[in-house]
């Protein structure tokens, strides 16, 4: 007995839905033993469907898992698969036919070895006739469709109904009709079997078909391998492990503010002009110093989460993010609360050079109590958020300076607009250590110092 499988992907990751449908009927009568394949119901509410492309033609053998025909509904296009062997003897509904009622005959199948030519003149009437799609109960019944067909001179015996279990799958999800060797070769060579025409029995793709496709499309094969696997360095593995740990273990929260740096830039220019080349201060040097002052005023931020305790540090050791050819590293400027701007600037430059040259000592990058990551050298970066450097509890992310129009009130009472240099900074805090109000207080102290930069000189 020939048993079909209907398959359909109802959802992207849907499990197989099992159904039982009386879609096969076994007939004997004046024709050789055969099976009538009927239009299946793909859902409880389906009353009719359309016939898509037939994947087999009369005389073709059907093997387990092969698609016989596509069934179309108003929502999807389904494959009609079989799980046992048989031969297609007659197609009763051609491709493109619409509104074929559920239960109406669509094809005839026979066992292998049966004379298919015996079904050349086989008609729908021979298969038991067809009915119209079910009519809703509130509509009058059409008497013409309810009348029985003219009985045949020799009544056929009662059909043997066969139920089956099956599953549904969209046609797009269909596995290519290919021999195992062809599938293996296609997988090795990166060939998409959906683009290969089969020359084997029933359109099955052979190994030779895959070889021909490979020879005729060298460009496609080259495009499929257009990438390079870069070995992961030890440093990259360390960065990945630490940042993954931080995101997983530290509940981040973020506080942002706009810093007016117009006064700071004027002070920086004045100090650099009077330095006679002894130093050249950067905005980052001022920010590092300001972080030291803010962290002494709000010491909770200058802490780290340890097993059983929160460790609060006496000195503010700022880890400065430096990009190197091998990845990001954070050398430490220690005790910034007690250092002057010139000393901080010299330490940052020396540590950054060592970092790029790969000459940092472990004690120069291991530890630290708080971090800063500055992308201000890139004018495209207005703001960003940074991941906390564990086991620290805070990191400051610094964007590029932006000219912002701000309203001003003149001495004569009139109003106008002036341009102000501003930087957006965003602090990331570990909520295990720092509460929201504490983080906001730290940002307020940082803003106060930066916008009144003479405090940095005290």
UniProtKB/Swiss-Prot annotation:
Q: What is its main location?
A: mitochondrion
> Could you tell me which residues carry N6-lipoyllysine?
75
Region: Disordered; residue ranges are 126-164
Residues of the Lipoyl-binding domain: 34-110
Q: Which GO terms describe its biological process?
A: pyruvate decarboxylation to acetyl-CoA
Q: What residue stretch is labeled transit peptide in the record? A: 1-28
Ranges where the Peripheral subunit-binding (PSBD) domain occurs: 177-214
Catalyzed reactions: N(6)-[(R)-dihydrolipoyl]-L-lysyl-[protein] + acetyl-CoA = N(6)-[(R)-S(8)-acetyldihydrolipoyl]-L-lysyl-[protein] + CoA
Describe its function. The pyruvate dehydrogenase complex catalyzes the overall conversion of pyruvate to acetyl-CoA and CO(2). It contains multiple copies of three enzymatic components: pyruvate dehydrogenase (E1), dihydrolipoamide acetyltransferase (E2) and lipoamide dehydrogenase (E3).
Per its record, how is this protein called by name?
Dihydrolipoyllysine-residue acetyltransferase component of pyruvate dehydrogenase complex, mitochondrial
What organism is recorded for this protein?
Neurospora crassa (strain ATCC 24698 / 74-OR23-1A / CBS 708.71 / DSM 1257 / FGSC 987)
Higher taxonomy:
Eukaryota, Fungi, Dikarya, Ascomycota, Pezizomycotina
């Amino acid at each position: 007995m020939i048993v079909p499988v209907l398959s359909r992907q109802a959802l992207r990751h849907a499990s197989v839905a099992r159904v039982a449908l009386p879609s096969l009927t076994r007939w004997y009568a004046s024709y050789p033993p055969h099976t009538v394949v009927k239009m299946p119901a793909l859902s409880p509410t389906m009353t009719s469907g359309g016939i898509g492309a037939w994947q087999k033609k009369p005389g073709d053998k059907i093997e387990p898992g092969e698609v016989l025909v596509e069934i179309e509904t108003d929502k999807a296009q389904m494959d009609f698969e079989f799980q046992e062997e048989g031969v297609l003897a007659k197609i009763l509904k051609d491709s493109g036919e619409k509104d074929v009622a559920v239960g109406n005959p669509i094809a005839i199948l026979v066992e292998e070895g049966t004379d298919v030519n015996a079904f050349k003149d086989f008609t729908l009437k021979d298969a038991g006739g067809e009915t119209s799609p079910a009519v809703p109960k509130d509509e009058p019944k059409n008497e013409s469709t309810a009348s029985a067909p003219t009985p045949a001179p020799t009544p056929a015996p009662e059909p043997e109904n066969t139920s089956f279990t099956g599953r549904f799958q969209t046609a797009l999800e269909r596995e290519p009709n290919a021999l195992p060797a062809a599938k293996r070769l296609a997988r090795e060579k990166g060939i998409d079997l959906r683009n290969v025409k089969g020359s084997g029995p029933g359109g099955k793709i052979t190994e030779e078909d895959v070889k021909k496709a490979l020879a005729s499309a060298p460009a496609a094969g080259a495009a499929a391998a257009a990438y390079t696997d870069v070995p992961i360095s030890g440093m990259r593995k360390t960065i990945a492990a630490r940042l993954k740990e931080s995101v997983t273990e530290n509940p981040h929260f973020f506080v942002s503010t706009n810093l007016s740096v117009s006064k700071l830039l004027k002070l920086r220019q004045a100090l650099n002009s009077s330095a006679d080349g002894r130093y050249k201060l950067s905005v980052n040097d001022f920010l590092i110093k300001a972080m030291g002052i803010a962290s002494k005023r709000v010491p909770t931020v200058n802490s780290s989460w340890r097993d059983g305790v929160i460790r609060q540090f006496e000195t503010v050791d700022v880890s400065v993010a430096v990009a190197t050819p091998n990845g990001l590293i954070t050398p430490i400027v220690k005790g910034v609360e007690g250092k002057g701007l010139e000393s901080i600037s010299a330490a940052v430059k020396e540590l950054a050079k060592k970092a790029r040259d790969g000459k940092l000592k472990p004690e120069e990058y291991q530890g630290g109590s708080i971090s800063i990551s500055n992308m201000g050298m890139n004018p495209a970066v207005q703001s960003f958020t940074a991941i906390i450097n564990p086991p620290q509890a805070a990191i400051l992310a610094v964007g590029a300076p932006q000219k912002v129009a701000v309203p001003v009130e003149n001495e004569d009472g009139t109003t106008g607009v002036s341009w102000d240099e501003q930087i957006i900074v965003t602090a990331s805090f570990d909520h295990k250590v720092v509460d929201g109000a504490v983080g906001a207080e730290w940002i307020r102290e940082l803003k106060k110092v930066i916008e009144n930069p003479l405090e940095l000189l005290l």
